Regions:
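Active-site pocket-lining segments that scaffold enzyme catalytic pockets across diverse folds
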Residues: 1-4
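Glycine- and acidic-residue-rich phosphate-binding/metal-coordinating active-site segment common to enzymes
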Residues: 8
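Hydrophobic transmembrane alpha-helices
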Residues: 11-132
Length: 132
């Protein structure tokens, strides 16, 4: 009898489909999370005051900042209320993170230029590929 009642209750539970944008946001989150870890691991293993040049550092001054921005972007999308594309509160957090880390990435570029010369970072983007 108890089994029949439980079966009936379990059958009445409706599982909502996960929106494609949420699945995409989760995939972006996982990509950014793994790559940010790789960037931090690489930086931790560098000889003191050497120019990082492998992996994403080949193209970006601060790829770990890029990954951080992607983490916030993916959370803003995954956490969006039903019927909207993004969560406004998390989007505000993203704006703060992009601004804060953008300034820091510019400072990092300046330091690299002083330490290693302009040619060492000439072809690298600060933080956002093809934009900044």
């Amino acid at each position: 009898m108890v089994g029949a009642i439980l079966d009936q209750r379990l059958m009445s539970v409706h599982v909502k489909e996960i929106p494609a944008k949420t699945i995409g946001a989760i995939l972006v989150f996982l990509y950014a999370w793994v790559n940010q870890y790789r960037c931090h691991k690489y930086l931790a293993g560098l000889i003191k005051y050497s120019l990082p040049e492998k992996g994403m550092f080949e193209y970006l001054i601060s790829p770990h900042y890029t990954c951080e921005c992607l983490l916030y972007l993916s959370m803003a999308i995954a956490g969006a209320p039903e019927g909207t594309w993004y969560n406004k509160t998390l989007l505000c957090g993203l704006v703060f993170i992009v601004t804060n880390l953008g300034v820091t990435a510019a400072g990092t570029r300046k330091w690299y230029v002083e330490k290693f010369g302009a040619s060492a970072v000439q072809k690298k983007w600060n933080m956002i590929p093809f934009l900044y």
